[in-house]
Swiss-Prot record:
Recorded GO MF terms: glucosamine-1-phosphate N-acetyltransferase activity; magnesium ion binding; UDP-N-acetylglucosamine diphosphorylase activity
Protein name: Bifunctional protein GlmU
Highest taxon of the lineage: Bacteria
Pathway noted in the entry: Nucleotide-sugar biosynthesis; UDP-N-acetyl-alpha-D-glucosamine biosynthesis; N-acetyl-alpha-D-glucosamine 1-phosphate from alpha-D-glucosamine 6-phosphate (route II): step 2/2; Nucleotide-sugar biosynthesis; UDP-N-acetyl-alpha-D-glucosamine biosynthesis; UDP-N-acetyl-alpha-D-glucosamine from N-acetyl-alpha-D-glucosamine 1-phosphate: step 1/1; Bacterial outer membrane biogenesis; LPS lipid A biosynthesis
Length: 461
């Protein structure tokens, strides 16, 4: 089967009150359009055509790697006119599935069923299949009109509906599937004689009836699948639905969430057994949590892998890190891109790392900056230690070998190497390589000035 998918993404989105095109607004960390394209990809189509118009160049430049064929709708003359723009690129014998970029939560299983409906009833594949839904509040949506036999013969848009039609609960989702040849016959016949002065795609239903093309419908199992986004309130509502579904899926697979309503996933999260996630945690990109991991409250993890038995304490921020088994991080720690921890490492409160590679058992427990540094096994980094890695132009590396003990308030001026089992005295500024197994310090004599008095403030006249 040749399957061609058309995604309508040309709308202006006036009710968003934004300079950003509506389809670029994010839900669960991704643009709305990306959600729909990723769902479409799971159907293995021959092509995905995205119809763009308002803010089109911004859309294309923001999503340059989408595997789609971009089709420009120069004038936004309605949904029917938008679909018509793609038809020259689609062979007559292909099936065409029409989706909307602002309906992001539609499920691939639903679309597969709709495609099957479009093939089921007639051997010449001329059926028009519509995705419909029953909504308690159908306001703003096109209503399905059926005859006495229950057959669909029309769809009436909200702005063209009388009070009787507005009372109908069954709505058209904007999603349909039929043979391309049907659309090529019907679309040029559309009229813009309606309240909006637009060429509605929904008018193809009346044309299908006139041509005696069978119309079938599939009712969406979940109302959220057909919910569109026209304003920021609706965006927030679907965000919470998406997050709740993601939370439920994680809990079904064995993770514990302290509060599913205070959990945010903005990418992919893979959890081992007996993972615990406290409140207000944000997971972005691809995050992997090994067996028995615990994530404290108010943490942010972006593109992070944690091994088994790791614990991240409250208010810690991790980005682009790979953490091995049984490590402890935080509270209030910041691990930046390029940080790698071997097993049994500890990063304590108010420690920042960047491009820092820790071997087994190494600890930095308090108040340190460790950037562009290689640390061996069982190193102890004292409070207030800083690797001074930037000379104003270039970054330089610090190497700290196995078993080193670094006293508090030490500055390591890179490039510099500290030999194995060396000890650095507290308050030292290390500018040259340190030999192994020795104590190195930069001594400044302590001096007492006897009889010195503090200045006394004088009262002003």
């Amino acid at each position: 089967m040749n399957l061609q998918i058309i995604i309508l993404a040309a709308g202006q989105g006036k009710r968003m009150y934004s300079d950003t095109p509506k389809v670029l607004h994010h839900l669960a960390g991704k643009p709305l359009l990306t959600h729909v394209v990723e769902t479409a990809q799971q159907l293995n189509p021959n092509a995905i055509h995205v119809i763009y118009g308002h803010g089109g160049e911004q859309i294309k430049s923001s999503l340059p790697n989408l595997p789609v064929h971009w089709v420009h709708q120069a004038e936004q003359l309605g949904t029917g006119h938008a679909v018509l723009q793609a038809m020259p690129h689609i062979p007559d014998d292909a099936y065409v599935l029409v989706l909307s970029a602002d309906v992001p939560l539609i499920q691939v299983e639903t679309l597969q069923s709709l495609i099957e409906c479009s093939q089921r009833q007639n051997p010449d594949h001329s059926v028009l299949a519509l995705l419909v839904a029953e909504l308690e509040n159908p306001s703003g949506l096109g209503r399905i009109i059926r005859n006495n036999q229950g057959e669909i013969y029309s769809i009436v848009e909200e702005k063209d509906a009388n009070e009787q039609v507005k009372n109908i609960k069954e709505i058209y989702s904007g999603v349909c599937c039929t043979l391309a040849n049907n659309l090529k016959k019907w679309l040029p016949q559309l009229s813009n004689s309606n309240a909006q002065g637009e060429y509605y795609l929904t008018e193809i239903i009346s044309l299908a009836v006139q041509n005696k093309t069978p119309i079938t419908s599939l009712t969406a199992k979940n109302s959220f699948e057909v919910q569109g986004i026209n304003n920021r309130q609706q965006l927030q509502q679907l965000e919470r639905i998406w997050q709740q579904r993601a939370a439920n899926q994680l809990m079904e697979k064995g993770a514990t969430l302290a509060d599913a309503n205070r959990f945010d996933l903005r990418g992919e999260l893979y959890c081992g057994k007996d993972v615990y996630i406290d409140i207000n945690c944000i997971f972005t990109g691809k995050v992997v949590l090994g067996n028995g991991c615990k994530i404290g409250p108010n943490c942010s993890l972006t593109n992070v892998t944690l091994g088994d038995g790791c614990e991240v304490y409250a208010n810690s921020v991790l980005e682009g890190c790979h953490i091995a088994n049984d490590c402890h991080i935080g509270p209030f720690a910041r691990l930046r891109s390029g940080t790698q921890l071997a097993s049994h490492c500890k990063i304590g409160n108010f420690v920042e790392t960047k491009k820092a590679i820790f071997d087994e058992g190494t600890k930095a427990s308090h108040l340190s900056y460790l950037g562009d540094v290689l640390l061996g096994k069982n190193v102890n980094v004292g409070a207030g230690t800083i690797t001074c890695n930037y000379d104003g132009v270039n970054k330089h590396q610090t190497i700290i070998e196995d078993g080193v003990f670094i006293g508090s308030d030490t500055q390591l001026i890179a490039p510099v190497t500290v030999g194995a089992n060396a000890t650095i005295g507290a308050g030292s500024t290390i500018r040259r390589n340190v030999p192994p197994d020795e104590l190195t310090l930069t001594e400044s004599r302590q001096k007492t000035i006897y009889g010195w008095k503090r200045p006394v403030k004088r009262e002003r006249d």
